[in-house]
C-alpha cells in the first residue's frame, strides 16, 4: 500500500489566485481606519487569518476592539463584492480532478466558512473533498498545526499519510508541525523561503506535481 493516502489542499493562492484581492481589500479597510499598510505588512500575513492580522496591526496602532471589528467587516465586504473576478490558479482544477482518481482529498484553509463554501461551489469541485477545515473549525489558525490535525482526523488518517499542497510560509509551518508531508507551490514566496519553512519539496506548476511516483518518492 502506498504511504500517501490523501492530498490536502490549501485554498487561497493554491486553488484560486486571490491574494491580490485580499491585499486590496485589506489596504482599503485599514485606510478607512487611518492606517496605511506596507507591502511588508501584507506579505507578513499571507496565509494567516484576517482576524489575526487585524488584531495584531490594530493593537500596534491603538485601534479599539470596535474599530478592529469595523476593519474586519469592511475587509470582508470589499472581498465579497469583488470575488467574482478572482481567477483560478492555472492547472489547479485539472490537478484536483486528476488527484481525486488516485487519492482521497481534503481542504484546510484559513478562509472563513462563507468564503470556503462559496469558492468550492463556484469552482464546481466541492463534491471531490471528503473533509474540509476552515477558520470556523479551529481555535488557533495557521501556523498552528490545529487545522491540519483537524482535517486529517476527519479523514481518519495519520498526518504522515497526507500530502499537503501549500503556497504560504505559515501554511508550510502549520502542516509540518502537524506531521504531514508538504509540497509548496512557488508563487508568493521564493523556493528557498518555502524550503526554509520546512517544505519537503517545491513545484512551479501543477503539471510538474502530476506524477504520483514522484509524490511517493518525496514523501518517503
Q: Where are the model-predicted features located?
A:
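Asp-based, Mg2+/Mn2+-dependent phosphohydrolase catalytic module
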Residues: 1-5, 97, 112-220
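Helix N-cap/coil-helix junction residues
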Residues: 35-37, 63, 125, 156-157
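Residue-level detector of anion-binding/catalytic polar loops
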Residues: 36, 104-105, 181, 200
Amino acid at each position: 500500500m502506498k504511504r500517501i493516502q490523501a492530498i490536502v489542499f490549501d485554498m487561497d493562492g493554491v486553488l484560486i489566485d486571490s491574494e491580490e484581492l485580499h491585499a486590496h481589500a485589506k489596504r482599503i479597510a485599514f485606510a478607512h481606519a487611518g492606517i496605511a499598510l506596507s507591502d511588508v505588512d501584507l506579505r507578513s500575513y499571507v496565509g494567516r487569518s484576517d482576524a489575526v492580522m487585524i488584531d495584531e496591526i490594530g493593537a500596534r496602532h491603538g485601534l479599539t476592539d470596535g474599530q478592529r471589528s469595523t476593519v474586519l467587516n469592511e475587509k470582508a465586504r470589499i472581498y465579497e463584492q469583488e470575488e467574482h473576478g478572482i481567477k483560478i490558479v492555472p492547472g489547479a482544477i485539472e490537478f484536483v480532478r486528476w488527484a481525486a482518481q488516485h487519492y482521497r482529498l481534503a481542504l484546510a484553509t484559513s478562509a472563513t466558512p462563507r468564503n470556503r463554501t462559496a469558492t468550492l461551489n463556484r469552482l464546481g469541485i466541492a463534491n471531490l473533498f471528503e473533509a474540509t477545515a476552515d477558520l470556523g473549525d479551529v481555535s488557533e489558525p495557521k501556523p498552528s498545526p490545529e487545522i491540519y490535525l483537524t482535517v486529517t482526523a476527519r479523514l481518519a488518517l495519520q498526518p504522515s499519510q497526507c500530502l499537503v499542497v501549500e503556497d504560504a510560509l505559515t501554511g508550510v509551518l502549520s502542516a509540518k508541525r502537524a506531521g504531514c508531508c508538504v509540497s509548496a507551490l512557488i508563487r508568493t514566496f521564493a523556493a528557498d523561503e518555502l524550503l526554509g519553512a520546512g517544505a519537503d519539496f517545491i513545484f512551479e506548476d501543477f503539471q510538474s506535481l502530476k506524477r504520483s511516483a514522484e509524490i511517493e518518492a518525496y514523501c518517503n
